[in-house]
Regions:
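Charged catalytic cores and adjacent phosphate/nucleic-acid-binding surfaces used
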Residues: 15, 27-48, 66, 124-134, ...
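A metal-dependent hydrolase metal-coordination microenvironment
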Residues: 30-158, 162, 170-171, 188, ...
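Compositionally biased, intrinsically disordered low-complexity segments enriched
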Residues: 6, 52-54, 178
Length: 384
């Protein structure tokens, strides 16, 4: 018995080590990048400019918002607690700058840009407006909404209209343009509109952004912990604004917003001006087999690799006298798909350069109008 006891090892150090390893794993901090390509001349930054904390009606401490965003692969966020709506003031003092100060300090350690903002929370019209790149949110706490907006403008803020079709202010869910919004645009006090808020898409707002040259925004308006609203492990994600900026600095983001260089990424939809969506698609999709052979009425397959996190749904042109193509092709995110090329006749021969016209149905350049693009490859036709 004593010999066995001398050769055995105590169990507790091993158990303690296991416990430490499990604890370390449970608290592992890791970032998942959002794979959407840069476009010529600009970086594609992933941003959320509408976020709440416990300092208004949110349920999360501000530093958690920075941590969530960094882990989800975002480059910048804005903390935009309500100015007028303070339901937690019995537990927390009203301190309009404090949530940004806490989140900003945490974001600095993660190299995440955290922008100071506020939500000017008024009845419709004009509704709720976000002002970001503020220098002092306290100055917006005034009775008159026009005075609040004028103060935001004086501070150099970028101002946008939140959730224009929100049923809390528009019970039928339809976005409506009021004379107050015309007034704001005319005085350079409205620079963008949320085309997407949470899981809601507002086609009227999409059209207004194009008509009135306003920036398109897509934001979460998150109140709860992120993983309660979005099933991240199943591939779900918050809506984000893509900002095409010269670099990742706050100044570059602000310049890009005022220049309207933005797009909307929500679910599997990408919404924006063609000048931005076209290069994103072209830089996402790579033709792996740019030259195929088709013998007679046989088939060949062009391999298309999608390097982005965006799935694409293509509707190719049906073909011509020599070749035919499928009516629909799905390009899953991060995977390679096969485009079938089928011959129509037994006796065709020669080499052709194909510029296959396609619509990308989940990339919208206008409401209900998909992006039109081309896929280029070569086909050698051989007689059977």
């Amino acid at each position: 018995m004593s010999a066995r006891m001398n050769t055995s090892r105590p169990l507790w150090p091993w158990l303690a080590g296991l416990a430490l390893a499990v604890t370390a794993f449970a608290h592992d901090r890791a970032r998942t990048p959002v794979r959407i390509p840069d476009i010529p001349g600009y970086r594609t930054l992933k941003c959320d400019f509408h976020i709440h904390t416990v300092f208004s009606d949110g349920k999360v401490w501000p530093d958690v918002r920075a941590e969530e965003a960094w882990r989800e692969g975002l480059d910048a966020i804005a903390i935009t607690d309500h100015i007028e709506y303070q339901p937690h003031k019995a537990d927390l003092p009203t301190a309009h700058n404090r949530s940004w100060e806490i989140a900003h300090a945490h974001g600095e350690g993660l190299q995440l840009v955290v922008i100071r903002g506020s939500e000017i929370t008024r009845a419709m019209p004009p509704g709720h407006l976000n002002a970001i790149f503020l220098t002092d949110a306290r100055a917006l706490d005034v009775p008159d909404w026009r005075a609040a907006v004028a103060e935001a403008q004086r501070q150099g803020a970028f101002i946008f209209w939140n959730h224009p079709g929100w049923t809390g202010q528009q019970p039928d869910g339809l976005s409506r343009w009021y004379s107050e919004h015309t007034e704001l645009v005319a005085s350079n006090q409205l620079h963008g509109i949320e085309v997407v808020n949470g899981r809601e898409y507002y086609p009227e707002a999409h059209a207004w952004c194009l008509e009135k040259n306003l920036a398109m925004l897509s934001n979460s308006d998150i109140h709860s912990p992120l993983n309660l609203d979005y099933d991240l492990h199943a591939g779900d994600h918050r809506p984000i604004t893509l900002v095409f900026a010269r670099d990742g600095s706050p100044d570059a983001i602000k310049e890009a917003l005022f220049a309207r260089r933005t797009a909307v990424y929500s679910g599997t939809l990408l919404i924006g001006r063609e000048e931005f969506l076209q290069p994103i698609f072209e830089r996402s999709v790579r033709v792996l087999t740019p030259h195929v052979q088709v013998r007679g009425t046989g088939r060949a397959y062009v391999q298309l690799h999608n390097e982005s996190d965006l799935p694409y749904t293509l509707h190719p042109a049906t073909g011509d006298a020599d070749l035919q193509f499928p009516r629909e092709l799905r390009l899953p995110a991060g995977r390679t798909a096969l485009l079938e090329v089928k011959g129509r006749a037994e006796d065709r021969q020669g080499e052709r350069t194909i510029r296959l016209a396609c619509t990308v149905t989940n990339l919208l350049v206008r409401p209900r109008e998909p992006l039109h693009t081309e896929l280029e490859f070569k086909v050698t036709l051989l007689p059977k």
